[in-house]
UniProtKB/Swiss-Prot annotation:
Gene Ontology MF: a single term: actin monomer binding
Taxonomy of the source species: Eukaryota, Viridiplantae, Streptophyta, Embryophyta, Tracheophyta
Pfam name, any one: Profilin
Motif Involved in PIP2 interaction mapped to chain: 81-97
Protein name: Profilin-7
Length: 131
């Protein structure tokens, strides 16, 4: 299965009639492996900072998580494994795997829990595959 198929079929899938607004799989180096059409353009340093928060949990808390034009307030995640952010009625979930980061962005009517489930389920599968 191509990386794009993982994004299209597993991240952008419908859940209870809703789906993520955008999603991507990005290497630890910030290189995009695959993304949905609406995924925001981002700076390499934004991905570098996300990776740094995985290595040093709490790194993003004082400044927030920036991705493209959006700043998310960092909320409780799983140190070293999952970063979650919130902005208004939407938010972001980032799951770290051995070689990549699975990123999902949502807005109402999708819930944070639905976003977490979609992103973390694919991330866990990739971890099981050694990716």
């Amino acid at each position: 299965m191509s990386w794009q198929a993982y994004v299209d079929e597993h991240l952008m899938c419908e859940i209870e009639g809703h789906h993520l607004t955008s999603a991507a799989i990005v290497g630890h180096d910030g290189a995009v492996w695959a993304q949905s059409t609406a995924f925001p353009q981002f700076k390499t340093e934004e991905m570098t900072n996300i990776m740094k928060d995985f290595d040093e949990p709490g790194f993003l808390a004082p400044t927030g998580l920036f991705l493209g034009p959006t700043k998310y307030m960092v909320i409780q995640g799983e140190p070293g494994a999952v970063i979650r952010g919130k902005k208004g009625s939407g938010g972001i979930t980032v799951k770290k795997t051995g070689q990549a980061m699975v990123v999902g962005i949502y807005d109402e009517p999708m819930t944070p829990g639905q976003c977490n489930m979609v992103v973390e389920r694919l991330g866990d599968y990739l971890l099981e595959q050694g990716l």
